[in-house]
């Protein structure tokens, strides 16, 4: 990176997070920091060894991005009694080429969801993912949605198209095409609900102390604080109390109450700090 026109060395820490998807709360379960010279999947396996023990009943399926679409990771999860859904990328993969050939003679399933038009091709029984301990299912979707784009300074409607591929150990008899599609897209919950929110409003991207134990302690403390605050916000506050008050706004209200002991909490009075000043 460059600072004041001079190139300097940038240091950063990398970690892997396990996060529950598909619910209305952002629920990060645990974090494992990557060690020097190791890749993300190695750290993820170490993390999941703990999570499979501590939170075994929380989930049945591990949803992951394309980095985890490999036999070693699939077999690791299968051996622990868990299924896998992973993004499938790369035109050179035997599995994707095989699926593309078989899908070419199929009519897609079609449905509309979340302002999208979806065409889906779904088959299981693939054995071309080398060294995986069970047959693999592949889902491919072509999706269209109307979006606003800026053209010559004006916002105009434009159709955006995207293609998605997933590989999974879950057979069609156990999970429908639409349910698998939803599970595959839920992989982004960890980005939208945790990483982006925690970096933007909770200081997750700031290293307060360069010590391995301290880094993990700060991250886990942040996770706990976010989960507790969300639980109070979504499970305790009534809709009229939440109206116009974002989650981070509630955090600021709580902080204000702590430093102003005589002030009534807005969730008791129904007025925000801005209303009472």
State what each model feature region is.
Residues 111-130, 199-277:
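A short, flexible helix-boundary coil/loop motif
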Residues 83-187:
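An anionic, glycine-rich sequence signature occurring as long contiguous blocks
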Residues 32-54:
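Active-site beta-loop-alpha junctions of metal-dependent nucleic acid enzymes
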Residues 1-23, 30:
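Active-site-proximal, Lys/Arg-enriched surface segment
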Residues 174-209:
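Short amphipathic alpha-helical "interface-anchor" segments enriched in bulky aromatics
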Residues 1-3, 71-89:
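A short alpha/beta connector and helix-capping loop motif
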Residues 18, 44, 59-67, 84, ...:
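Short, conserved catalytic/metal-binding motifs centered on acidic residues
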Residues 63-71, 90-92:
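Acidic, metal-coordinating catalytic cores used for nucleic-acid/nucleotide bond scission
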């Amino acid at each position: 990176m460059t600072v004041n026109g001079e190139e300097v060395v940038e240091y950063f820490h990398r970690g892997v997070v396990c996060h529950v998807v598909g619910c209305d709360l952002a629920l990060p379960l645990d974090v494992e920091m990557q060690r020097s010279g190791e890749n993300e999947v190695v750290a993820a396996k170490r993390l999941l060894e703990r999570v499979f023990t501590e939170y075994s009943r929380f989930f049945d399926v591990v949803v992951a991005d394309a980095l985890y679409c490999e036999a070693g990771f699939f077999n690791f999860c299968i051996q622990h009694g868990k299924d896998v859904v992973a993004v499938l990328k790369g035109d050179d993969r035997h599995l994707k080429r095989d699926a593309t050939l078989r899908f070419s003679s199929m009519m897609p399933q079609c449905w509309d969801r979340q302002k999208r038009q979806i065409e889906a091709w779904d088959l299981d029984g693939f054995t071309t993912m080398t060294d995986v301990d069970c047959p693999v299912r592949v889902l491919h979707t072509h999706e269209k949605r109307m979006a606003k784009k800026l053209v010559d300074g004006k916002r105009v409607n434009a159709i955006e198209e995207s293609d998605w591929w997933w590989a999974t150990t879950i057979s069609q008899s156990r999970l429908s095409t639409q349910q698998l599609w939803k599970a595959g897209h839920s992989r982004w919950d960890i980005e939208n609900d945790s990483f982006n929110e925690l970096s933007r409003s909770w200081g997750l991207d700031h290293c307060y102390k360069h010590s391995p134990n301290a880094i993990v302690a700060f991250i886990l403390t942040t996770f706990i604080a976010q989960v507790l605050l969300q639980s109070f916000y979504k499970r305790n506050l009534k809709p009229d109390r939440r109206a116009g008050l974002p989650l981070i706004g509630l955090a600021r209200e709580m902080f204000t109450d702590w430093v102003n002991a005589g002030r009534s909490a807005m969730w008791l009075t129904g007025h925000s700090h801005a209303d009472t000043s």
